[in-house]
UniProtKB/Swiss-Prot annotation:
Annotated GO CC locations: cytoplasm; ribonucleoprotein complex; ribosome
UniProtKB keywords: Ribonucleoprotein, Ribosomal protein, RNA-binding, rRNA-binding
GO biological process, one term: translation
Protein name as it appears in the record: Small ribosomal subunit protein bS6
GO molecular function per UniProt: small ribosomal subunit rRNA binding; structural constituent of ribosome
PANTHER family with a match to the protein in the record: MITOCHONDRIAL 28S RIBOSOMAL PROTEIN S6, SMALL RIBOSOMAL SUBUNIT PROTEIN BS6M
Coiled-coil region: none
Primary role: Binds together with bS18 to 16S ribosomal RNA.
Organism superkingdom: Bacteria
Lineage, highest ranks first: Bacteria, Pseudomonadati, Chlorobiota, Chlorobiia, Chlorobiales
Entry similarity comment: Belongs to the bacterial ribosomal protein bS6 family.
Species, as recorded: Chlorobium phaeovibrioides (strain DSM 265 / 1930) (Prosthecochloris vibrioformis (strain DSM 265))
Length: 133
């Protein structure tokens, strides 16, 4: 019996598009996930960013992360549909395992905006105390 697993889908949409086609592309990705039997947990729109290298001669992409749960066979169906969408420059679906989730919690815990040297020293002291445990 398959149980739903937690996945993360990162998509890069053509950043040269206007806001409306980008919103439609995001809605399409979410619709594909839910139609194929997935359940969306969260959506994080990162926004337009410069890509590390040109993708299909485009250097600006609109980045988004979608966390969802689904059965393992559903992932192949989702990828099959996303593969043929022209507005998506890239997509990647990964299974979020326990070590990845623990690492994410640690990164979120220590990723504070450090404004003053005192804040930086306090964050470093807290990190060293955690490492000693």
């Amino acid at each position: 019996m398959e149980t739903n697993k937690l996945y993360e889908c990162t998509v890069i949409i053509d950043g040269g598009l206007q806001d409306e086609p980008i919103a439609e592309a995001m809605a399409m990705v979410q619709k594909v996930i839910t139609e194929k039997g997935g359940s969306i947990k969260s959506v994080l729109d990162i926004g337009r960013r410069k890509t590390a290298y040109p993708i299909n001669k485009k250097t600006i992409g609109y980045y988004a992360h979608i966390e969802f749960t689904a059965d393992t066979p559903v992932i192949a169906e989702i990828e099959r549909v996303l593969r043929y969408e022209d507005v998506l420059l890239r997509y990647l679906i990964i299974h979020l395992t326990t070590p990845l989730l623990e690492m994410r919690k640690r990164v979120e815990k220590y990723s504070v905006v450090i404004g003053s040297p005192e804040d930086k020293a306090a964050a470093e002291a807290e990190a060293s105390e955690e490492e000693k445990k």
